[in-house]
UniProtKB/Swiss-Prot annotation:
GO terms for cellular component: axon; plasma membrane; receptor complex. Glycans are attached at N23, N39, N337, N418, N430, N445, N458, N513, N525. It comes from the Eukaryota. This is Tyrosine-protein kinase-like otk. Pfam families: I-set (PF07679), Ig_3 (PF13927), PK_Tyr_Ser-Thr (PF07714). Its main location: membrane. Residues 1-22 form the signal peptide. It is found in: Cell membrane. Residues 25-115, 114-200, 252-366, 369-464, 469-559 form the Ig-like C2-type domain. Residues 694-1035 form the Protein kinase domain. The gene is otk. It is a single-pass type I membrane protein.
């Protein structure tokens, strides 16, 4: 079967190629290859010649496959429109196929290629550096059109460079010959094309160094004594020296340029122009090899031989490197006076020009440079065209681009100058007319005005709002009818303009002219009625609906049964009985299924009400017999599927624990679930916070289950108790439990011992804790900066489950390396989770600021904060390891450890947090895998393959966090790979990890062990903390 399909496909492709080669001449308008900027729209036009009595059906192929139309890619008449072109999906060949509905003949156009213009990034690469030459390359990830090539500009310390003296610009390369101290600085490049302009992320810093060759005086047959093997010899260069490079001698003084080009000339586009270069050539040099050259922007433009000598071989060092040396009839270089004349100036002639005399064996003689500025004529590029807009489309654009000198201002008006643009229509900075939520009021004539000092030009386009035709009642079949009977085939359509309906039989159009009017009736609503059906009426009937927005077609099969085609009576009766029995069985099974489902629903409802009654009774006992109204009517628990409703404000905080043995149930599972629900509700009531205590809420992004805010919490609502004290208790208790000292008696002894130690704080650590307690007491009256996570997706069970998991994680840990959970706001939807936040915000933004990637300058400070030292990076990593070790000791896993999910304060205290801004701010760092947003570049292989999260997977992510710290978070892990490639390599075990270059050697081995495939071979957080502590101690020594 597969071989048959392949054979049919090859035959169809061969037929299409034959149609392309033989019938392309039948097209009146062929689709043309185009280059378009990414995210802009493009139209492929197609129209074929046809007999006026017949019609054509058009369809489009993309890379040999039929296009599936949607709101972004759709067909307008015979033309194809693509909105917001994407290079990953839309690049390729497009073929228009025209099918005659009368004869069924198909014609295919030659393929039209679509190229997408884009520009992503630029970087400076060092190709070579020595004392004679410095060679840099600007590497750009971009694609440009043939009409608008990629433009490269070089900068040294923010000053733009041009070809001058020892600096040469050669396409993407920068060549500096004989570099000296004057060439020291930071070199960057910018790249621009029709898609935009980018600057290199990191430049190249060049520092010239004194180069001298140390030489020791040595006579013939003289050997150095052995004692000299450890002597130190100094090499001192002469200040201001050239490093031993011999320059060419200066040319004779009587060979000189008398007058060079004007320093600044302004010429209108289309006017003639001439650049002057008067020179003096002595008689004694007439037979010498002398060449007159004109350069534009440092590149050789034209040259001519002077005197009676033979021409110079080649073009010296410029041979083969200057792309401007080409034939152009507009340019003429006059040998007699050195003048460079232009017959008519065009926009590309603008630039810096310089005249040069080159005498063989001598340094060139250069004139002063002159700048030619071209006043470009005001014009539209391209001319705006009319457009059909789809009704209710979320966004539609009409482009209007104008060029001229000075840069023109573009405006849009509707109908006339006195009519403003309608609602939801705006003009962006590039002059593009943007329609949002297209409606019928957007129809009309729109005029684009381009204005500058030259004057004003305008272009008027017609905007029409259309609705793609749709079947309101499509043909349904197959239809079986007896001979001489009547049959009705429905076909009704909606659209704007009102679509026309055309019927055909076996691809032959049907109309009142070619059918029996007494038997065939075409109703006004599009329905086809056939009376006195004949045997020849059997076949495939097609209904085609269409308007200016496109065409659609549906087929239905009509089967006509005659008396001679019937079965014997006994056989027919048997078939009818079988069909009836099958229908009865099917209906019986369906009815039984419905009854079963309804019964289960009623049973589940009864059980749920019984559980709620038991919960309400338990809550009443806990509250001392005062039952809230919400519990009485039983509606509180159904309003919020994630968390139970808060009762009576803060009343839950004063309730005591209930007896766990009360109200036992006969059903063990229900009893356990009731006790778990009671315990969870009791915990959430202990965490209750009033919503009025939150002030100055500012949204900073969106997470996996709702919006994320930063605000302030009143100091009176912040629970007392230092995390550092609880941290010490937690670690000491964990140590005791590991030593086997668990039990009620030992536990009370340990607590009393800890209390005694707290009363007698004499060590340096205890003194520091006392200072922290005093500082916290002083700041207790200040409002607390908090992070607020809203639970918007209350109907999403997966989001609710993740919300509860984060609550349990942060509620169960009290450590100075982990943010505190201040409480929950559950008075109304959405629920708020209130977490501790810091004044410096998340760690990733702090790292980017210290790396100079975030603009932190203000009016008083013009420099970015300095980058972190190795000691500071190790201190940050150590604090994160301590916080993660506390999470491990509490038997929890984080699952999304990264610098973006850590916070840092102005006191350089780092805490593990959980903002998880995966929907907007850090959406690049998440990828949807198996219908879930995952940070795949931070996840261990077992998390991606088996969805298994353990402490060892957190250790894997911690290794990536340390990699981020040493790279200042300036790039993503494996940013050269796409998300799909990262997943494939991780699952195959071929994803290779390397530590950052600035990582200390003592940490390389243990960090590499964090990324091994076997989770059991990865280190623990305590081992990582010990290694980091040793590394910090070694740096301090």
């Amino acid at each position: 079967m597969a071989a048959l399909r392949i054979s049919v496909w090859i035959l169809v492709q061969a037929l299409m190629m034959a149609l392309v080669s033989s019938n392309s001449s039948h097209f009146l308008q062929l689709p043309q290859s185009q280059s378009v900027v990414e995210n802009e729209s493009v139209d492929f036009e197609c129209q074929a010649s046809t007999d006026p009595s017949s019609e054509l059906h058009y369809e489009w192929l993309h890379n040999g496959h039929r296009i599936a139309y949607d709101k972004r890619v759709y067909q307008i008449g015979s033309h194809l429109h693509i909105e917001a072109v994407q290079r990953a999906e839309d690049v390729g060949d497009y073929v228009c196929i025209a099918t005659s509905l009368a004869s069924g003949a198909r014609e295919a156009s030659p393929p039209a290629k679509l190229s997408v213009i884009y520009i992503d990034s630029a970087s400076v690469q060092l190709l070579g550096s020595n004392r004679n030459e410095l060679l840099l390359k600007c590497h750009v990830e971009a694609v440009s059109g043939s009409d608008d090539p990629l433009q490269i500009e070089w900068y040294r310390n923010s000053a733009k460079l041009s070809s001058w003296q020892n600096v040469q610009l050669d396409q993407h390369r920068l060549i500096i010959r004989q570099p000296s101290a004057a060439d020291d600085g930071l070199y960057r490049c910018t790249a621009s094309n029709a898609a935009g302009r980018v600057m290199s992320k990191q430049g190249y810093v060049y520092r010239s160094s004194l180069k001298c060759l140390p030489r020791l005086p040595r006579r013939k047959n003289q050997k150095l004594p052995e004692s000299w093997s450890k002597e130190v010899f100094l090499c001192r260069g002469k200040r201001g020296g050239s490093g031993g490079v011999e320059a060419l001698p200066s040319a004779p003084e009587d060979l000189r340029i008398v007058q060079g080009p004007a320093s600044h000339a302004i010429i209108k586009e289309g006017d003639p122009a001439a650049l002057t270069c008067l020179y003096e050539l002595p008689a004694e040099l007439q037979n010498q090899r002398i060449q007159l050259r004109w350069r534009k922007d440092g590149k050789l433009l034209r040259h001519v031989e002077l005197g009676n000598s033979l021409p110079l071989p080649g073009i010296s060092s410029d041979s083969g490197k200057d792309a401007l040396l080409r034939e152009d009839a507009r340019l003429v270089l006059h040998k007699q006076n050195g003048t460079l004349s232009f017959a008519s100036i065009i926009a590309s002639d603008a630039g810096q020009y310089q005249c040069q005399l080159q005498l063989e064996g001598y340094a060139p003689i250069n004139s002063s440079p002159g700048t030619l500025e071209v006043i470009e004529q005001l014009k539209f590029v391209p001319q705006p065209t009319s457009k059909n807009l789809e009704l209710d489309a979320p966004i539609a654009k009409v482009h209007c681009k104008a060029q001229g000198t000075p840069t023109p201002q573009v405006q849009w008006m509707r109908d006339d100058a006195n009519t403003s643009l309608p609602d939801q229509v705006e003009v962006d900075a590039n002059g593009t007319l943007i329609f949002r939520n297209v409606n019928a009021d957007h129809r009309g004539n729109y005029t684009c005005l381009a204005t500058n000092s030259q004057g004003q030009i305008n272009a008027t386009v017609a905007i029409n709002v259309v609705v793609t035709p749709k079947f309101s009642v499509p043909p349904v079949g197959p239809i079986e009818t007896a001979e001489q009977g009547n049959v009705v085939i429905h076909c009704q359509a909606i659209g704007d303009p009102k679509p026309t309906i055309q019927w055909d039989k076996d691809l032959t159009y049907l109309s009142e002219n070619n059918t029996d009017r007494e038997r065939f009736r075409f109703l006004e609503n599009g329905t086809l009625e056939i009376r006195n059906v004949q045997a020849e009426d059997e076949g495939s009937y097609g209904c085609t609906i269409g308007n200016s927005a496109g065409l659609k077609r549906e087929d239905v099969q009509l089967v006509v049964k005659t008396a001679g085609d019937g079965f014997p009576p006994e056989e027919s009766g048997g078939d009818g009985f079988l069909v009836t029995r099958a229908v009865l069985i099917t209906m019986t099974v369906a009815l039984a299924y419905i009854v079963l489902v309804v019964g289960l629903m009623l049973w589940c409802r009864y059980r749920r009400q019984a559980r709620k009654a038991r919960l309400n009774e338990l809550s009443t006992k806990e509250a001392g017999g005062d039952q809230p109204d919400g519990a009485a009517n039983g509606k509180g628990s159904e309003q919020e599927p994630c968390l139970s409703k808060q009762r009576n404000g803060h009343g839950g905080q004063s309730r005591s624990k209930s007896n766990g043995d009360a109200q036992k149930s006969d059903d063990t599972a229900c009893s356990q679930q009731s006790r778990a629900s009671k315990k969870s509700a009791h915990i959430y009531e202990q965490l209750a916070l009033p919503r009025s205590g939150l002030t100055e809420l500012i949204q900073i992004g969106r997470g996996e289950f709702g919006d994320v805010f930063v605000g302030k919490l009143k100091a009176s609502l912040v629970a007392t108790g230092s995390p550092s004290d609880k941290d010490a208790d937690t670690e000491k208790q964990h140590s005791n439990s590991e030593n086997g000292s668990g039990g009620s008696g030992s536990g009370s002894t340990t607590l009393s011992t800890l209390n005694e130690k707290r009363r007698s704080k004499t060590s340096m650590d205890d003194i520091e804790e006392i200072k922290e307690e005093e500082q916290e007491q002083q700041q207790s009256d200040l409002d607390q900066l908090v992070l607020v996570k809203a639970l918007n997706k209350v109907k999403d069970e997966q989001a609710c489950q993740e919300f509860r998991r984060q609550l349990d994680l942060l509620r169960g840990i009290s450590h100075k390396g982990v943010v505190r959970l201040f409480g929950l706001c559950r008075e109304k939807d959405p629920h708020y989770m209130v977490l501790e936040y810091t004044d410096w915000g998340d760690l990733k933004q702090f790292l980017l600021a210290t790396a100079g990637k975030v603009n932190t300058a203000s009016a008083a400070a013009t420099s970015s904060p300095p980058p972190l030292t190795t000691s500071q990076v190790l201190a940050v990593a150590y604090q994160i390891a301590r916080g993660m070790d506390a999470i491990y000791r509490a038997r929890f896993t984080h699952r999304d450890l990264a610098t973006r999910n850590c916070v840092i304060s102005s006191e350089f205290i780092v805490k593990v947090s959980y903002p998880a801004l995966c929907k907007d701010k850090y959406s690049r760092e998440y990828h949807k895998h198996r219908n879930t947003l995952l940070p795949i570049r931070w996840l261990a292989p077992e998390c991606i393959q088996e969805d298994e999260y353990t402490t060892k997977s957190d250790i894997f992510a911690y290794g990536v966090v340390v990699w981020e710290l040493f790279n200042q978070a300036t790039k993503l892990p494996h940013e050269e790979l796409t998300n799909e490639q990262v997943i494939q390599k991780s699952q195959a075990g071929t994803l290779e990890w390397t530590v950052a270059e600035s990582t200390p050697d003592s940490l390389r081995e243990i960090l590499l062990s964090c990324w091994v495939s076997n989770p059991k071979e990865r280190p623990s957080f305590s081992q990582l903390g010990a290694a980091l502590s040793k590394a910090m101690q070694s740096l301090e020594k």
